[in-house]
Swiss-Prot record:
This is Queuine tRNA-ribosyltransferase. SUPFAM superfamilies: tRNA-guanine transglycosylase. Residues 248-254, 272-276 are annotated as: RNA binding. Keywords: Glycosyltransferase, Metal-binding, Queuosine biosynthesis, Transferase, tRNA processing, Zinc. Belongs to the queuine tRNA-ribosyltransferase family. The lineage of its organism: Bacteria, Pseudomonadati, Spirochaetota, Spirochaetia, Spirochaetales. GO terms for cellular component: cytosol. PANTHER family: QUEUINE TRNA-RIBOSYLTRANSFERASE. It is an enzyme of class 2 (transferase). Binds 1 zinc ion per subunit. Homodimer. Within each dimer, one monomer is responsible for RNA recognition and catalysis, while the other monomer binds to the replacement base PreQ1.
Length: 375
C-alpha cells in the first residue's frame, strides 16, 4: 500500500510509492485542488500531460452541487468527471466549520446552512463516509473539526475529543464498506497548537490503524514558526511506515518544510488562485505580470520551464491577455503555476535521492526569497 524507497540521510525527507486504485502515486506529491472535480481553467488532459496522478475534490461542494444523486447516476466521481487518475476527497469539514455563523457542532454531527441558498443540512461521520464511498474516492478523508488558531485550551480539547470520536465512527463505516471498494481511509489528527492535545489526538488516531494519517489544523493563519513547531512535533509522533498528509499547504516554504519533516502529500488552492490574478510562480519568486514593466518584455516567464506558456509566449503577450481579460491568460498562468509546483517537487525528489535535500532546501528558498525582496 505504501512503500518507502529512499530516506534522506540528513533529514526526515523520503521518497515513496502510494498504491491507489487508479494507479501508483510517487511521493512527495503535490495535489492540485479540483474542488468540484475539475481544476479551474485547466482541462483534464492538460493535468495528465503535466503528470498529475492525484487530484483533490471536495465532498461539501459536490454534495451541494451537482448533488450525490447525480454522481450516483454516473456510477462514481471518475465516470462523472472522466478523470481516470486518482481522487482524494476532502470531507468538507473545513468548509462547514468555516461557516461559523451558519453551523452548529454536536457530538452526533454538524448542522449547517448552504452557502448557496441558505438551506439547512446535517453531516455526520457516517453520512460523509457514505458520500465518498458513492464517489469511489481513492482516498477518503474522515470528518473532523479544524479549530481556528488562537482559541483557548478547553475549546481546543473539546474539538479534539469530538474529532477522535468521529474518527472511530468513520473507521467503523469504512470496515463495513461495500464489497469491492478499495479506496484508502485517512484519519486526521487535531489538537490546535497545544502539544499535549496533539499527542493525545495522534495516539488515539494511531490506535485505529487507518491506512494513512493526516495532520490537520495547521497552516490556518498562525506564524510560520508556530507552524513549523507543530508540524515537526506532530509528524514525529506518526510511525514512518504510514503515509502522511498535511492539508492546505502550497507555498514553496511550507512545502519544503513539510518534506523536510517527512510529509508525503499536500494540497493547496493557492497556485491556481494567484494565477487567476496574474501572479506567476518562478524559481526567483513571484512574477506579477500586470505590472507595466512587462509591457514590452519579449522573454518567457521562466527560461527553465517547459509549460505551454513558457515555451511559446512572451511576458508581454501574457500581460496583454490579462489586461484584455482574455480567458487564455488565466489558462496559461494556471498551467504554469501547477507545472511549477510539480517541477519543485521533482527537484526535491532528486535532492532526496542524492542525500542533498537539506542543502537544496536552503539554496532554493534563499534564491526564491531574494527574488521576492527585489520586486
Amino acid at each position: 500500500m505504501f512503500n518507502i524507497i529512499k530516506n534522506d540521510k540528513n533529514s526526515n525527507a523520503r521518497l515513496g510509492i502510494l498504491e491507489l486504485p487508479h494507479g501508483n502515486v510517487a511521493t512527495p506529491c503535490f495535489m492540485p485542488v479540483g474542488t468540484l472535480g475539475v481544476m479551474k481553467a485547466l482541462k483534464h488532459d492538460v493535468l495528465e500531460k503535466l503528470g498529475c496522478d492525484l487530484m483533490l475534490a471536495n465532498t461539501y461542494h459536490l454534495y451541494l452541487r451537482p448533488g450525490i444523486d447525480v454522481i450516483k447516476k454516473y456510477g462514481n466521481l471518475h465516470n462523472f468527471t472522466t478523470w481516470n487518475k486518482n481522487f482524494l476527497t476532502d470531507s468538507g469539514g473545513f468548509q462547514v466549520f468555516s461557516l461559523s455563523n451558519f453551523r452548529k457542532i454536536e457530538d452526533e454531527g454538524v448542522d449547517f446552512k448552504s452557502h448557496i441558498d441558505g438551506s439547512r443540512h446535517y453531516f455526520t461521520p457516517e453520512s460523509v463516509f457514505s458520500m465518498q464511498e458513492t464517489f469511489e474516492s481513492d482516498i477518503i478523508m474522515a470528518l473532523d473539526i479544524c479549530s481556528p488558531y488562537g482559541i483557548d485550551y478547553d475549546e481546543a480539547s473539546l474539538y479534539t475529543n469530538i474529532t477522535t470520536s468521529w474518527a472511530r465512527r468513520t473507521l467503523c463505516a469504512y470496515k463495513n464498506r461495500k464489497e469491492g471498494y478499495e479506496g484508502l481511509l485517512f484519519l486526521i489528527t487535531q489538537g490546535n497548537f497545544f502539544k499535549d492535545l496533539r499527542k493525545r489526538s495522534t495516539e488515539s488516531i494511531l490506535e485505529l490503524n487507518s491506512p494513512g494519517i493526516a495532520i490537520g489544523g495547521i497552516s490556518v493563519g498562525e506564524p510560520r514558526d508556530r507552524y513549523l513547531e507543530i508540524l515537526e512535533y506532530n509528524s514525529s509522533l506518526i510511525p514512518k511506515d504510514k503515509p502522511k498528509y498535511v492539508m492546505g499547504i502550497g507555498t514553496p516554504h511550507y512545502i519544503l518544510d513539510a518534506i523536510y519533516n517527512g510529509i508525503d502529500i499536500f494540497d493547496c488552492v493557492n497556485p491556481t488562485r494567484i494565477a487567476r490574478h496574474g501572479s506567476l510562480l518562478t524559481d526567483n519568486g513571484i512574477l506579477r505580470i500586470n505590472r507595466a514593466e512587462f509591457r514590452f518584455d519579449t522573454c518567457s516567464v521562466e527560461r527553465e520551464c517547459s509549460c505551454t506558456l513558457c515555451t511559446r509566449y512572451s511576458r508581454g503577450y501574457l500581460r496583454h491577455l490579462f489586461k484584455s481579460e482574455e480567458a487564455l491568460g488565466v489558462m496559461l498562468a494556471s498551467e504554469h503555476n501547477i507545472h511549477y509546483m510539480f517541477r519543485l517537487i521533482n527537484k526535491a525528489k532528486n535532492a532526496i535521492m542524492n542525500d542533498n535535500f537539506v542543502k537544496f532546501r536552503k539554496l532554493y528558498l534563499d534564491k526564491y526569497d531574494e527574488g521576492n525582496l527585489n520586486e
